[in-house]
Amino acid sequence: MSEVKSDIQIAREAKMQPINDILAKINVPDESSAFSPMGRHIAKINLEYLDTLKDKPNGKLVLVTAITPTPAGEGKTTTSVGLNDGLNKIGKKSIVCLREPSLGPSFGMKGGAAGGGYAQVVPMEQINLHFTGDFHAITSAHNLLSALIDNHIYWGNKLDIDVRRIVWKRVMDMNDRSLRSININLGGVANGFPREDGFDITVASEIMAIFCLSNDLEDLEKRIGNITIAYTRDKKPVYAKDLKAQGPMTVLLKDAIRPNVTQTLENNPAIIHGGPFANIAHGCNSVIATKTGLKLADYVVTEAGFGADLGAEKFLDIKCRKSDLKPSCVVIVATIRALKMHGGVAKDDLKTENVEALKKGLVNLQRHVENVKKFGLPVAVAVNHFIKDTENEVKALIEFCDTIGVKASLCTHWANGGEGTKELASHVAELCEKNEDKFKFLYESKTPLFKKIETIAKEIYRADEVIADTKIRDQLKSFEDAGYGDFPICIAKTQYSFSTDPSLKGAPTGHSLPIREIKLSSGAEFIVVICGAVMTMPGLPRVPAADSIKLNKDGEIEGLF
């Protein structure tokens, strides 16, 4: 048996084409007015060029989501890349639009996030590390606002900011639990007024959300100005624009907001831009990137983070609501290993055939299919094939999908690239072409905020009730009174269960949704509802991926998979 190559080995063997050749495939002219090269294999598309595309018709939008995942993930990015390559193989002009990886999980639990096997975007090492510096710009803009807040207080606090009611934390793009709650301005009067503060991870930042939901620079600046940063001693809101912060923050983001273009291993175009997490944020790449893809190709394949209860719900109820995007089809990625886990199999036994456990775990897939159909969208299932999957297990999964009225396609893109997704690609194209445009939101914008939360909890998570104390309910009422009642809901919870208890696998019922905290994102224009024990600053696992990452004697990176 031949040695199985690692993702990084495969990526290094890629025969990448110059980025201007990749852009030529989607008719972007080889002119400085259209794009700015960032080396030989990456470019940023200029906003002025994007303005010239406004009158072009849109292509078909395909959303890739997944069943409730294992900690290793079920391969949404890999499947998105593979499906994009498959669509191009069957003669469809397609672009994949992905999120940028965060350094947190790259050095933490999951490792890199540029696909896997023969379904990757490249140059993989650059994409997984600093890429084009977008996350640095977002982090810098966010922390500039933090610095301006404390500076304003130091120089007299003309706005009468109550230091006990500052709601704007600092951020960094790393998993570091020690920074969740800190004291700042210590060391004497020269350093300011001591107060409590903390850090979130950059991908949970409201700046990241605004960056990904803005339509252009003007919209970006307006939204930044509308960020609620604190409250006065009279409990009146203080906004970023009160500190004149929107101008310099937009300056820091003016280049980052241009979409990044790179390529797949099969030299098909990929747009990689923005990267909020889906468990603690809205989990979708930028609106600008998605709209760019729709103007340049007949099909755009994009993914939303974690399971369909998180990323897909937020993509449909937040991103689509804010941008007038409408998917033509949704692909749910399922793996045999995750379904066996939902059927009660222990992690160490997932590689052993167990058809009965698989059948028991299929309730998880069934619920995700039912949930997506509530949005009026056609569904396809992509079975992301692993080497240890058996014929009996695959057969049981595909036959089950037939009984619930969806077609499942066995996908071998990890081993075979686009050739391994041609069946899925053909089915997706068929669903897109006959889409009857029945897309609808789960709730109306005018629905009261608490009712919106209840709707998501009961319709998507299948909870019996939402638990919220008087303080939470009063906060929601105050948001409505302040004019934010039309905002959609962004629920932050564990990605490992429909419930807030990560140990409840399968399709649990009879549980409740306890609200721990709510946050107003007045710039991003949604309400964050934090449930259970989920953290907006993750920690590293006992054995982080960083333990295996190093430079070898040839100066090459090892361990970044």
Curated annotation (Swiss-Prot):
Similarity annotation: Belongs to the formate--tetrahydrofolate ligase family.
Annotated binding of ATP, by residue: T70, P71, A72, G73, E74, G75, K76, T77
Catalyzed reactions per annotation: (6S)-5,6,7,8-tetrahydrofolate + formate + ATP = (6R)-10-formyltetrahydrofolate + ADP + phosphate
Protein's recorded name: Formate--tetrahydrofolate ligase
Highest rank taxon of the organism: Bacteria
GO biological process: tetrahydrofolate interconversion
EC annotation from Swiss-Prot or TrEMBL: 6.3.4.3
Keywords for the protein's UniProt record, in alphabetical order: ATP-binding, Ligase, Nucleotide-binding, One-carbon metabolism
Pathway(s) it belongs to: One-carbon metabolism; tetrahydrofolate interconversion
InterPro entries in UniProt: Formate_THF_ligase, Formate_THF_ligase_CS, P-loop_NTPase
GO MF annotation: an example: ATP binding
